[in-house]
Amino acid sequence: RLFYFTTLGWMMWNWLASGLATGATLLLYDGSPFHPGPAVLFDYAEKERMTHFGTSAKYIDAVKKAGLTPCMTHDLSSLRAMMSTGSPLVAESFDFVYRSIASDLHLASISGGTDIVSCFVLGDPTRPVRRGEIQGPGLGLSVEVWTEDAKKAPTGEKGELVCTKPFTAMPLQFWNDPGDVKYKSAYFERFGFVGAPEAQLPGPVDQRRVLWLAVGSETAA
């Protein structure tokens, strides 16, 4: 029973709809997450026996600032996972979720983008959850953190998130972009194609099939 609080204009709506392919029951909500009361989404989770609760880091922070303790006021025993995206989930928010929402769920901070309608890095139920961190790359994604000179960043050092190999959800071109000028500028201007021999494809190389994405300090984890 999958829920993600999202508008139709956010890519998470498309992400949510893809849950139908797994046989999941989708739970939808339209309106303010704090009306008619600040706990309305937890009311919904309890009533519908929600198993997967998706939201944003800002929502979790707002719930914390509102002083809510859903673990004391609601029956959330059906909840198995909580997902957060939109911005980095800080360590203190991890603490709040496990202290005030549920102590036995899988909390997953995820990061992707509208361009791919997917996640580059996300939760992994087979790995331990560490406060302030994202657990690992999505299936089939060659994700690395690079320095400004296009080298792998040492562990613990901030850098740019890059995906060095083609993957199924990557965009191939932009609409009304003759010669792929805007496309190449958006994805290849920073690092280009140089320095990633592992991204070479069999036969002639088509640069449109390799994506480089920089997301700044969000890769600190």
How would you name each of these model-derived features?
Residues 46, 80-210, 217-220:
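Conserved AMP-binding/adenylate-forming
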Residues 36, 40, 74-77, 178, ...:
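A general alpha-helical scaffold signature found inside nucleotide-binding enzyme cores
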